[in-house]
Amino acid sequence: VNRRRGYALALAASVLIAGMGAARPTPAPTRTPSPSPTPTPSATQSDGTLQILTYRGYAEYGGTSPKVNWVGNFEKETGCRIAKLDTVQSAKEMEDLSAQRPYDVISAGPALAAKLIEDKQAQPIDPAKVSGYDDIDKRFRDMSTVSGKVYGVPYLWGYHEFIYDSTKVKGDLKQAFASDRVALRDSPLTIADAALADGSAKDPYELSQDELDRAVALLEQSKGRTYWRSPIDLVQGFATGSLDYAQATPYYRLLLQKAGKPVKALQTPETTGWVDSWMLGVNVPDTTCAYRWLNWVTAANAQRDAAAWVGLAPANAKACKGRAKAMCDLYGRGKKLDRVAFAVRPPGDCRADSGECTDYATWGKRWTALLAK
């Protein structure tokens, strides 16, 4: 048995790393392409260089595979030099780094994007300067538009599902939350998934105090569960037999199935998802290279490569060919996305100051308290 489990783990890990990369793939050192001067707190450099903050796998420079070097190609074709490329594994790491120093461009998720806009740390983008912007799905474009101003260029997106070992348990969503053998994403936004499972909330990101309490109560049922930050933990959990359920993406279900694990997805009427978008820093004195980067990452070819590499879907519909077709088919398109509640930073459009809804700070406190139990 141990030998079979070891083989399954090795196979899953090899597929994970070598097959298609990985969404927020295996940890790799932060890359500084060339020595960069110490940044000033007021502005980034304006000498034809770029300073980028993104997730691992979103802007490859050949460190994982010499055949995957988008940064090098960008530099050759545009004449702009990437002076600093900081990569992170989690949204929390990205928020922490973005608060420490300025960047020209950041690939932010919905919670951080809203914070950057609210704190005036991101500047509006002129979509007329971004070739291919209109090729991006309108629903994604609308998510990055605030008061008529565009603040982000949608890049990659995905959604969550609950997967389970079909030889051990049945597909029951509330049982998944109650189980000690379940792995949930380590994020306050997981409260939205609990709200969907509870079924009392109309919008999982606009929760009243009572709805928040009900969602957290559902999460508190199990004190022995795992909270993951790296998706590789999911692969290890199912490969070694220590997990019965997990919150994952369709991509990781596919990886486990290819590794011979009998995992299936729970069928739910609604689920949560997210869109990562490229944003422009507020203190960029010369945006020439920043806009060249935005044009580069909006193009179908760039999004096609990234989607196939990290196991997510491209925001540009024209990228759904060739290498990325499998990801587009896996996540779905068109009306299939109507069941996805795409994340916003709570309370979304609801007014927290009136007491109608709970804000993200409250979610964060409840999440921290949950992990401490």
Where are these predicted regions, by residue range?
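Extracytoplasmic ligand-binding site segments that recognize negatively charged/polar headgroups
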Residues: 55-67, 102-103, 107-242
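C-terminal region of N-terminal signal peptides and the immediate post-cleavage residues
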Residues: 18-46
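Early extracytoplasmic/lumenal segment of secretory-pathway proteins
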Residues: 39-115
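Periplasmic-binding protein-like
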Residues: 135, 158, 212-221, 257-282, ...
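A ligand-binding cleft/hinge motif common to bilobed small-molecule-binding domains
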Residues: 112-115, 239, 245-262
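Mature extracytoplasmic/periplasmic domains
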Residues: 281-346
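A bilobed periplasmic-binding-protein/Venus flytrap-type ligand-binding module shared by bacterial periplasmic
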Residues: 161-168, 196-200, 274-287, 297, ...
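Conserved C-terminal helix/tail region of periplasmic/extracytoplasmic solute-binding proteins
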Residues: 342-373
